[in-house]
């Protein structure tokens, strides 16, 4: 979902890099946060292979990583682009934990 903002550049996700390194604690913020169009900071959380594991856990892991590493300092707003057709409760985590003040539903 960040590819257009990053001028077609592919981005390594938090979970992909954590799997390669062995733990999310072994990642540096600058390795997963890229600056795109109009200086928008972009991060992809990533997730498990389809049918394996819970994609919501990826969102939880990524958001916690971003918070712990100061990604939310000096920003005007944060936008999460998440799937809405999945039964996993992990996708509701930003709402449940008070990380979202407003929610916009976009369908296509």
Swiss-Prot record:
The keyword Oxidoreductase applies. Keywords: 4Fe-4S, ATP-binding, Iron, Iron-sulfur, Metal-binding, Nitrogen fixation, Nucleotide-binding, Oxidoreductase. Its cofactor is [4Fe-4S] cluster. Its EC number is 1.18.6.1. It holds the Pfam family Fer4_NifH. GO terms for biological process: nitrogen fixation. PROSITE patterns: NIFH_FRXC_1 (PS00746), NIFH_FRXC_2 (PS00692), NIFH_FRXC_3 (PS51026). It comes from the Bacteria. InterPro entries: NifH/chlL_CS, NifH/frxC, P-loop_NTPase. [4Fe-4S] cluster binds at residues 54, 88. Homodimer. Belongs to the NifH/BchL/ChlL family. The key enzymatic reactions in nitrogen fixation are catalyzed by the nitrogenase complex, which has 2 components: the iron protein and the molybdenum-iron protein. This is Nitrogenase iron protein.
